[in-house]
């Protein structure tokens, strides 16, 4: 973990020295729920070492919502992004609007900080299953021959979700991010 922090600090310093206005860092780590205490300690150490002018953001998973360790993780960050896509089994698809809305409401009740919701802006192919589980092709080809099933989200599903969200915007929700 120390090596990660050192590398991150070196990168932000290099970018700033090159004239780039670095305003924050976002950590996208899909920690297992049982590992949230370790993740909290990492974020706490990172927060202590980051310049105070830099914001610290994290991504969060719906699986964390029921964990008693989630508030401690959220306390370390200035903001978060709740990822409500591609968190179910590939057979269930990329996105479930009513379930995502449920997660957003639960998350809003737990987080004391501003947050955004991550929605899918991509598709993927479900190529099949083997002993290791699902073979999913997303950002790079697996070069597997055979038939696959494309997983996408219909624009109307997203529109319906956004309409439901707009009817009762949870506190601290600051917007949507497309992943």
Question: Where is each model-derived feature located?
Answer:
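Well-ordered, non-membrane alpha-helical segments in soluble/globular domains
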Residues: 2-10, 40-45, 94-104, 152-163
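Chitinase-like catalytic core of GlcNAc-active glycosidases
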Residues: 1-76
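Aromatic side chains
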Residues: 39-42, 85, 179
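Substrate-binding cleft of secreted/luminal carbohydrate-active enzymes
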Residues: 122, 127-179
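A structural motif corresponding to the C-terminal end of an alpha-helix
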Residues: 14-21, 49-50, 76, 106-115, ...
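Substrate-binding surface in catalytic domains of secreted glycosidases
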Residues: 44-134
């Amino acid at each position: 973990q120390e090596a990660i922090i050192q590398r991150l600090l070196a990168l932000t310093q290099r970018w700033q020295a090159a004239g780039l206005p670095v305003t924050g860092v976002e950590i996208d780590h899909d920690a297992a729920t049982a590992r949230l205490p370790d993740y909290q300690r990492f974020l706490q150490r990172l927060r202590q070492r980051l310049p105070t002018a830099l914001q610290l953001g994290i991504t969060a998973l719906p699986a964390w919502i029921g964990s008693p360790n989630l508030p401690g993780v959220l306390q370390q960050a200035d903001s978060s992004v709740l990822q409500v896509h591609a968190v179910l089994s590939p057979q269930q698809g990329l996105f479930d609007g009513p379930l995502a809305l449920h997660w957003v409401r639960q998350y809003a009740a737990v987080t004391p900080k501003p947050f955004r919701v991550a929605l899918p802006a991509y598709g993927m192919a479900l190529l099949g299953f083997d002993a290791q589980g699902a073979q999913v092709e997303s950002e790079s080809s697996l070069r597997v021959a055979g038939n696959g099933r494309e997983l996408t989200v219909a624009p109307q599903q997203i529109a319906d979700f956004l309409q439901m969200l707009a009817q009762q915007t949870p506190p601290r929700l600051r917007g949507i991010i497309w992943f």
